[in-house]
Amino acid sequence: MMYHIPGVLSPQDVARFREQLEQAEWVDGRVTTGAQGAQVKNNQQVDTRSTLYAALQNEVLNAVNQHALFFAAALPRTLSTPLFNRYQNNETYGFHVDGAVRSHPQNGWMRTDLSATLFLSDPQSYDGGELVVNDTFGQHRVKLPAGDLVLYPSSSQHCVPPVTRGVRVASFMWIQSMIRDDKKRAMLFELDNNIQSLKSRYGESEEILSLLNLYHNLLREWSEI
């Protein structure tokens, strides 16, 4: 399943990020890509050795960790270190699949269950550059407002078509979920959404408490901690 997570960063935060990224050191995006991806990747990334990068990636981690909808959809166990990329002048990233595991500075290795892109450019400011994802439901083309994030299974083939006008800047990361199975995770997300909707409409009740009990028992049964 694919999820749109709005408002991860406020407009003020986005503007500050963009201003700081204008001063960043950018390097060839292939430095963080395996052999397969390097053949189709042509973009730039912020140098991960820079002081600015360390500060910005911490802010992204704090923002996603505090976003209730992100947590409900991803049920994250481990988040990768966020990276930042830039596309301009017909730069592109052809169809590829993210690696199944990635190194992690604290945990050694992590499994990539979900991929996330946090958009930092106004969609009207550039042409092309949509995130194109192929999954069992067909092809999806995603171009969200700055500050919004999209979550999708890391097992999906995806690409970024050439940016023919303007500049597309984004942050991206991977998530190892407490729930490995996409279908089980989607069911828990739907159940959680319905519980929250019923609570806001009718207040607390024995029936809602029973559904909460069901949710947590399923999470307890399926989670890998």
Curated annotation (Swiss-Prot):
Instruction: Extract the Pfam families matched here.
Output: 2OG-FeII_Oxy_3, PKHD_C
Necessary cofactors: Fe(2+); L-ascorbate
> Which residues of the sequence carry a binding annotation for 2-oxoglutarate?
168
Q: Which residues cross the membrane?
A: none
UniProt keyword Iron, yes or no? yes
Q: What are the binding positions for Fe cation in this chain?
A: 96, 98, 158
Single GO term (MF): iron ion binding
**Do you know which InterPro entries this protein is assigned to?**
Oxoglu/Fe-dep_dioxygenase_dom (IPR005123), PKHD_C (IPR041097), PKHD_hydroxylase (IPR023550), Pro_4_hyd_alph (IPR006620), Pro_4_hyd_alph_FE2OG_OXY (IPR044862)
Q: Which GO terms describe its biological process?
A: DNA damage response; intracellular iron ion homeostasis
Print the keywords alphabetically: Dioxygenase, Iron, Metal-binding, Oxidoreductase, Vitamin C
> Locate the Fe2OG dioxygenase domain: which residues?
78-177
Q: Which PROSITE patterns match?
A: FE2OG_OXY
Enzyme Commission designation: 1.14.11.-
EC top class, as a word: oxidoreductase
The cross-references to SUPFAM superfamilies, in alphabetical order and at most eight, read: Clavaminate synthase-like (SSF51197)
The free-text cofactor remark is:
Binds 1 Fe(2+) ion per subunit.
The name this protein carries in UniProt is: PKHD-type hydroxylase YbiX
